[in-house]
Amino acid sequence: HRIMDGEFYAYAKELKELGVIRHIGMSTHNPAVARLAAESGRIEMILFSINPAFDMLPASENMEDYFKETYDEQLGGIAPERAELYKICEKNNIGITVMKGYAGGRLFSAETSPFGVALTPVQCLHYALTRPGVASVMAGYDTIGHVDAAVAYETAAEEEKDYATVLSKAPAHAYYGQCTYCGHCAPCPAGIDIAMVNKLYDLAVMQPEVPAALKAHYD
């Protein structure tokens, strides 16, 4: 409400009326906040984090609350708050652009995936694109190979897109203990950028050797 009824939204609305921008969207990790936006009649698109692991998390005002303190051993399937959000967006013609579709690449490895089984880029993309209301997925690439792996979705067979087998084995608390780089733990009393440190760590452990670009952050 502070955003929608404050100076920031008023400024964005003014820019739209002047023709400087054509649409107004917003970004959030929280399904409750996203739902308020989708039902407000003032937001046209939402940038929202969607992947199989995140969809099993309960709603919270703080992404950090999704972890140890609140996970439920009996929790299973898609969190109802998120499923309802997707339906509301589709009903109200609010387009969802997906972020975190690959969970930072962690879903590609059995060692780092909360499911204990690796998913492919095609499976992750298919999962996101088959949610109600989803219009597109914003993926990140480091190499041409990453681009090729995503574009392969266009010609993939149905069996290559199938993610149901992996999801059927998902633990109840799918993303327990994992950092999502949301920044809600800030500020750190010691001045440490916790989200960035965890992001660099996750990128490093997914490579045979620490890339020079990552090392440069510590020079």
Language-model features: where?
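Structured C-terminal cap/extension of enzyme domains
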Residues: 39-42, 66-219
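Glycine/proline-rich, positively charged
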Residues: 1-97
